Curated annotation (Swiss-Prot):
Entry-linked InterPro entries: PSII_PsbU (IPR010527)
Localization per Swiss-Prot or TrEMBL: Cellular thylakoid membrane
Organism encoding this protein: Picosynechococcus sp. (strain ATCC 27264 / PCC 7002 / PR-6)
Protein name: Photosystem II extrinsic protein U
Coiled coil ranges: none
Keyword terms of this UniProt record: Electron transport, Membrane, Photosynthesis, Photosystem II, Signal, Thylakoid, Transport
Length: 138
């Protein structure tokens, strides 16, 4: 009985290998009917570009900036920058002065640099995935 089963399995295996190993031939698309549909290519839009054209590209946005953007300001990176990001969103630039438990030195640094900040509504393109503290730029 086992020889019959072995022989049968061998035949099935040989037939399967022979049948499934044949590669189908590629056939050209028939375009003789004159109707060709093509995708309409639109202009690529990066959602960040619109925001960067605004004041965000010139000043540090308190609601959308990553911690690394604060490196250009002396005394902000990383501690004060992290506190600013953790207490966002802000309705106005002056709201950053209301962060709890700021030292006098930190408060003075914020007041000195208020003109370098802006506030825009939080944009998913910049804060999606909670990547404001570690953007992965190394």
């Amino acid at each position: 009985m086992s020889r019959v089963v072995s022989a049968l399995m061998g035949l099935v295996l040989m037939f399967g290998c022979a049948f499934f190993s044949v590669q189908p031939q590629a056939q050209a698309l028939d375009l003789s009917n004159g109707f060709v549909s093509a995708a309409v290519l639109g202009e690529r839009v990066n959602p960040a570009d619109k925001v960067l054209e605004s004041e965000y590209g010139k000043k540090i946005d308190l609601n959308n900036a990553s911690v690394r953007l604060f490196r250009e300001l002396r005394g902000f990176y990383p501690t004060l920058a992290k506190r600013i990001i953790e207490n966002a969103p802000y309705d106005s630039v002056e709201d950053v002065l209301n962060i709890p438990d700021l030292s006098e030195k930190q408060l003075a640094r914020l007041e000195e640099n208020l003109e370098r900040f802006t506030v825009t509504p939080p944009a998913d393109v910049f804060i999606d995935g909670d990547q404001r503290l570690n953007t992965g730029d190394y």
